[in-house]
């Protein structure tokens, strides 16, 4: 608990009691409004509206889908997002990051003024990873200038919008720290949903997977918006997930929605 909220007269006794009651065991109705209240208290103390940063917003959604409590969880999340991002007069702005672009109809239907940036967007493209210039400069500063080609072979390959040669920050920082090549990113991600869809996929999808394993190109139709309720029926959903997760990159867009 933050002393600024519990000491003095910033909060009333009822508000202090509500603040103390925040826990993983609280009721959903209270929990969904808790960030809104925190924004209110911070505004009262600092006199400024609050910026909310929410990382990996889609991770619990994937878990809810895989483990069978999707409807219950999305109902709660919709209430949480409404209270936090829409009916919150103390909010300056918010940034949500995640791997998948969840369909607006799932949890964002009540929100306005959303600016969605994806792997195919040019906006902020160079900020989702390290550029080659940044990586090579770091290698020189760490006395690893002779490892540029090796690092490029291992960690180059991401494309955001029209920007190619984007490097994974986690892999690069780990390499600079340990000075040893390794698949650092592979140990950090959960692929439960992707694995499930691949196992249930049709033969033609598996044939395309074999083509990819031969380092060849494929042409597929995809929609960057993930509609979890339709994953089992949408045979192209796996490509959307693989693209968003960084396993695929766009080489050429023939028309919107074509990879």
Q: What would you call each of these model-derived segments?
A:
Residues 1-259:
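Phosphate-binding site recognition
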């Amino acid at each position: 608990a933050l002393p600024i909220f519990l000491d003095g007269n910033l909060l009333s006794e009822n508000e202090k009691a509500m603040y103390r009651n925040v826990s993983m065991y609280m009721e959903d109705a209270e929990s969904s409004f808790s960030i809104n209240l925190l924004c209110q208290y911070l505004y009262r103390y600092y006199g400024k509206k609050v910026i909310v940063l929410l990382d990996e917003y889609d991770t619990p959604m994937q878990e809810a889908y895989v483990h069978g409590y999707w409807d219950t969880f999305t109902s709660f999340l919709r209430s949480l997002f409404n209270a936090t991002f829409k009916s919150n007069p103390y909010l300056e702005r918010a940034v949500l990051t995640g791997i998948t672009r969840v369909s607006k109809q799932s949890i964002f239907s009540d929100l306005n003024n959303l600016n969605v940036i994806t792997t195919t967007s040019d906006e902020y493209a160079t900020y989702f990873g390290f550029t080659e210039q940044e990586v090579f400069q770091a290698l020189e500063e760490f006395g690893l200038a002779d490892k540029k080609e090796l690092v490029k072979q291992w960690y180059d390959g991401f494309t955001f919008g029209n920007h190619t040669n984007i490097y994974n920050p986690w892999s690069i920082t780990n390499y600079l720290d340990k000075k040893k090549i390794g698949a650092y990113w592979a140990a950090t991600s959960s692929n439960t949903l992707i694995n499930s869809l691949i196992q249930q996929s049709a033969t033609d999808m598996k044939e395309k997977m074999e083509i990819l394993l031969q380092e060849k190109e494929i042409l597929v139709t995809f929609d960057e918006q993930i509609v979890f309720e339709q994953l089992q029926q949408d045979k192209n959903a796996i490509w959307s997930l693989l693209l968003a997760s960084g396993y695929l990159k766009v080489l050429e867009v023939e028309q919107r929605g074509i990879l």
